[in-house]
Amino acid sequence: MELYPRPERLLVELRARGIADNAPVLVEMLSKIDQLHYHGTAALDIAIERAEIGSASRVLEIGSGWGGCARWIAHRTGASVTAVEVQADYDRIGRSLTARAGLDDRIMHVNADFLDFQLAGTYTHVVSWLALFHIPDRPRYLGKIADALEPTGVLWAEDLYASDPVPNNERAAFNARLFPNSLVTLDEYSAGLHQAGLEIVGTEDMPQYWGHFTATRTAAFRADRAAFEHRHGSATFEALDRFYDGMASDFARGFVGGLRVLARKG
């Protein structure tokens, strides 16, 4: 599975900002370009506050990408974070950036499928941003999340859910774009958490908010086309443009919705 092309493009962006390969990098600067979810560190600060992540927290992140969320959480709170990412190239770059940011004493990167990840203990928090719907076998991974949490531990997730039906002639393209291996309806989403022993404390429905974000992101990306292609080439631009435009369309046409959810192990 490769949602985004050329994970090395983040290193190109750092060079364009005058930061050489292997040079130290500040989290505050890195966080402006290493976030793969919606609304960047503002979304992470909401999670930190509402899920009450602090210096004594032990956090497991599922689907860590470049490690941007893990670094921000560790930097802002002092928490220890285990960052699990299935894509080897993203994990490799993520762990390198974590070391360059001086956070490798707080963050452990693991290149693994979450379903195969061996739990070595329990966590106060499990967090995930726009990753859970990619993982197959939803009952199994929700059960594993519950197993990973200590008693009264907290799950915080931003995720997609299925909304209006996707036309049959568009289903193949939709699947290729999203890898929606466990995309379920909102009712099914809540029921699955309950069945896994995770009781919902609060939810926030996000489709209008994220729909606006994805549309604005596409427009801004296209406005910067010349500069982006100069750094990364036209093939990378075209691949990202198709993805960004497709996501904006999926929200606008009601094929997907989005939510924030806070749940606690019962």
Question: PLM features: residue spans?
Answer:
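Short alpha-helix
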Residues: S182-G197
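Short, glycine-/aromatic-enriched active-site segment of Class I SAM-dependent methyltransferases
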Residues: L160-P180
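A short acidic, Gly/Pro-enriched loop at the edge of an enzyme's catalytic core
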Residues: Q118-V126
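A short glycine-rich, Lys/Arg-flanked "PGG" loop and its adjoining helix->strand segment in the class I
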Residues: P139-V154
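Conserved alpha-helix/loop element of class I SAM-dependent methyltransferases that forms part
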Residues: H37-S55
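Class I SAM-dependent methyltransferase SAM/SAH-binding core
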Residues: L60-I62, W66-L115
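A short SAM/SAH-binding and catalytic strip from SAM-dependent methyltransferases
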Residues: H125-D137
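Conserved Class I S-adenosyl-L-methionine
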Residues: G202-G266
